[in-house]
Amino acid sequence: MSKRDIVLTNVTVVQLLRQPCPVTRPPPPPEPKVEIEPQPQPEPTPVREEIKPPPPPSPPPRPATPPPKMGPAPRELTVGINGFGRIGRLVLRACMEKGVKVVAVNDPFIDPEYMVYMFKYDSTHGRYKGSVEFRNGQLVVDNHEISVYQCKEPKQIPWRDVGSPYVVESTGVYLSIEAASNHISAGAQRVVISAPSPDAPTFVMGVNENNYNPGSMNIVSNASCTTNCLAPLAKVIHERFGIVEGLMTTVHSYTATQKTVDGPSKKAWRDGRGAHQNIIPASTGAAKAVTKVIPELKGKLTGMAFRVPTPDVSVVDLTCRLAQPAPYSAIKEAIKAAAKGPMAGILAYTEDEVVSTDFVGDSHSSIFDAKAGIALNDNFVKLISWYDNEYGYSHRVVDLLRYMFSRDK
C-alpha cells in the first residue's frame, strides 16, 4: 500500500469517526418539529412507557421454572417384551397399531430370523400388513428398530441398555412378584405380567385401573383374558342391579398348552386329550379372580371352562341371581349405556346374529350378545359375552402400560 493510500484511508477513518457526532446532533432538529405539533407531546410518554418494560425480569423466571424441565413429562413410553409367543407377538402388533414404541424383545428359544417369520405370518390373525425384517442384528418392524436378546433369565436381560422400558412378561413362567422382580433388577421400570399372578396387584382396564399406585406398584398383573371379559360385565350388572350369586362358564378356544393329540398331562389328565378332537372340561380361576378387581363379589362368583376345538375367540356365560329385580330389556339397556359411555372400547354391545369367527381381531375385552342371553325371571338371568382371547387381551396389556405410564408421569 502506498503512502497516498494510507493517507486516504486515514482521512476516510477520520471522516467516519466524525460522522457519528453529527448523527447525534441531528435528533434535536426533529424535536422542534415535534414541538410544532402539539400532539407528539403525548408520544414521549408512551416512549417512557416502553421504557417500563424493564419489568421483563418476569420472563426470566419463566425459563427458570423447573417444572417443565422435570424430564419425565416429555419422556416417551418404551416397551420391552419377554417371551415372543402368542401374546408376545400380538402385544407387538398392538403396540405398532397404537403407536407405542417397542425397544427390545427377548426370547431364548427363537432365533431372530425365525422371529421375523413368526411375526409376519399368523394362521389366525393373518399376515402382518407392514414390513418386518432382521437387519444389522435387530428386528425391524415398519422401519422401527427393535433390539433382540436371547437371555434365559430375566436378570440377564440388559434392559438398561435400551433405556429401562416398561416390560411385558409374557413367558407364562415368571408370574410372582419375586420372579418378575428380576426384570426390575435388570433395569426395567415397570413389569406387567400377561397372566394371573398369585401375589401381584391385579388390574382390569375399565374396572379397577384407578387403584394403581405408582409409588408402590412396579409389578402388576393384567389378569387373564377370561377375567378381562367377565369383570366389565359383572361390574355393570353388580353396580346397577346387584349380584347375589353367580356361576360363570367360559367356552374357551384351545391354547398352546394343550395337546394336538392325546399325550401326558400331570396336572389334569383330561387336559392331555387331543384339543382338536374333544370338548374338554377344565378348571379356571377367572371367576374368583374377578373378586380381586371387584372385592364386593368375594364369595359370590365361581366358574369353570370348556376347552373346545376352535383356534380363537371364546365366550363367557354368566348366570346370576340379581338383588334388584329387572326385566331382561333393562339389563340390555344398562350394558348398552356402559358400552357407549364409561366402558367404550372395553365393553361392546351387539344384537346381530353373530358366531365366534365374527370376533376374530376384535380389540374389545367383552362383547355382550343381547340376543343370546335369556332370563328365567326378573331375578335370575343368563348373560352371554364374546371375546377374542388373544387379540383383545393383547390390546388391554398395551392399554394398561399406557395408563401406568400416564400415572407415573
Curated annotation (Swiss-Prot):
It holds the Pfam family Gp_dh_C. One of its GO terms (cellular component) is cytosol. It is an enzyme of class 1 (oxidoreductase). The active site is at 225 (nucleophile). It catalyses: D-glyceraldehyde 3-phosphate + phosphate + NAD(+) = (2R)-3-phospho-glyceroyl phosphate + NADH + H(+). It is found in: Cytoplasm. Pathway: Carbohydrate degradation; glycolysis; pyruvate from D-glyceraldehyde 3-phosphate: step 1/5. Keywords: Cytoplasm, Glycolysis, NAD, Oxidoreductase. Its EC number is 1.2.1.12. D-glyceraldehyde 3-phosphate binds at residues 224-226, 255, 284-285, 307. Residues 18-76 are annotated as: Disordered. The keyword Ribosomal protein does not apply. May play an important role in regulating the switch between different pathways for energy production during spermiogenesis and in the spermatozoon. Required for sperm motility and male fertility. PANTHER family: GLYCERALDEHYDE 3-PHOSPHATE DEHYDROGENASE (PTHR10836), GLYCERALDEHYDE-3-PHOSPHATE DEHYDROGENASE, TESTIS-SPECIFIC (PTHR10836:SF79). The testis-specific N-terminal extension mediates tight association with the cytoskeletal fibrous sheath of the spermatozoa flagellum, possibly via interchain disulfide-bonding of Cys-21 with sheath components. Homotetramer. This is Glyceraldehyde-3-phosphate dehydrogenase, testis-specific. It comes from Macaca fascicularis. The lineage of its organism: Eukaryota, Metazoa, Chordata, Craniata, Vertebrata. The gene is GAPDHS.
